[in-house]
């Protein structure tokens, strides 16, 4: 899985000088932009201009260009030839496609995790579940979203299916983005606790039902989040128009 820690921190050698090479600069920039898109700092449709990003992140345009290519491959960025890139705007069709894939992928991952998990993996899943609950209670929205995504990633690891893990890595950014649309963090944490319990008891039938319900919750959360943002935009527009007419 991708590191969602503090991506702006640069590595240094023993003498205190920077040891970042071209490759590590590209990785760092990619992580910064990926997190900012998933966390909602850079909104859908916003411009990603190489020159501006290079200045902002203190690098040349080469790692910016490579990072944008990588993020386009992950489905987070729309590259436009001979002009700037933009943060991808997921259409209803895009969301429907992702939900169809997740319906198969998530349920299979949870079922296999319930069947094949080991003690070490289960302990890792429990720790991540507990962390997500704590972050939710503390009101750490970004942290709770990242922890929720980590929970799903660990479940895929526990499936013991290498191909599922590879597919999970391919879908990782899209799924993290979708999970970041959840506003009811406590409800998500509660469902994760129920899923963990079913996995721990190797109850495949129960975990299948819970996973299907969890997917339904995810879709509902996304729809509510979209409605809330649209309402906020409308209210902001009305407020500006009212101020201009005064």
Label every model-predicted segment.
Residues 1-111, 115, 219, 223-246:
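Short linear motifs at protein or domain termini
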Residues 2, 126-133, 138, 177-246:
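C-terminal all-alpha effector/ligand-binding and dimerization domain
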Residues 24, 122-123, 185-186:
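Short helix-capping and inter-helix turn/linker motifs at the boundaries of alpha-helical repeat units
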Residues 34, 38-39, 54, 133, ...:
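Solvent-exposed, non-membrane alpha-helical residues enriched in polar/charged side chains
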Residues 91, 118, 140, 202-203:
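Acidic/polar helix N-cap motif
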Residues 98, 125, 144, 148, ...:
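Hydrophobic packing residues in well-ordered alpha-helices of helical domains and bundles
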Residues 101-114, 147-184, 221:
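Hydrophobic, amphipathic alpha-helical faces that serve as interaction scaffolds
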Residues 108-133:
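Amphipathic alpha-helical dimerization/coiled-coil segments
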């Amino acid at each position: 899985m991708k590191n969602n820690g503090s991506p702006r921190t640069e590595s240094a050698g023993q003498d205190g000088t920077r040891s970042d090479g071209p490759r590590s600069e590209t990785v760092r920039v990619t992580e910064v932009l990926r997190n900012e898109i998933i966390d909602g700092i850079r909104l859908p449709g916003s411009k990603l201009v190489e020159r501006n990003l290079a200045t902002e992140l203190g690098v040349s345009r080469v790692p910016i260009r490579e990072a944008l290519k990588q993020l386009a491959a992950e489905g987070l960025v729309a590259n436009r030839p001979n002009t700037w890139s933009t943060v991808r705007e997921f259409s209803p069709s895009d969301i429907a496609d992702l939900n169809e894939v997740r319906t198969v992928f998530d349920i299979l991952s949870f079922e296999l995790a319930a069947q094949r998990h080991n003690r070490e993996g289960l302990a890792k899943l429990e720790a991540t579940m507990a962390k997500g609950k704590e972050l939710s209670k503390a009101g750490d929205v970004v942290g709770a979203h990242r922890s929720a995504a980590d929970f799903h990633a660990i479940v895929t690891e526990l499936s013991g299916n290498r191909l599922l893990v590879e597919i999970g890595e391919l879908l990782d950014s899209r799924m993290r983005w979708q999970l970041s649309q959840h506003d009811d963090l406590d409800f998500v944490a509660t469902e994760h606790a129920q899923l963990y319990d079913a996995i721990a008891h190797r109850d495949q039938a129960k975990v299948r039902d819970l996973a299907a319900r969890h997917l339904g919750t995810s879709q509902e959360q996304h729809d509510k989040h979209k409605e809330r943002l649209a309402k906020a935009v409308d209210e902001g527009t009305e407020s500006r128009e009212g101020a201009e007419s005064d």
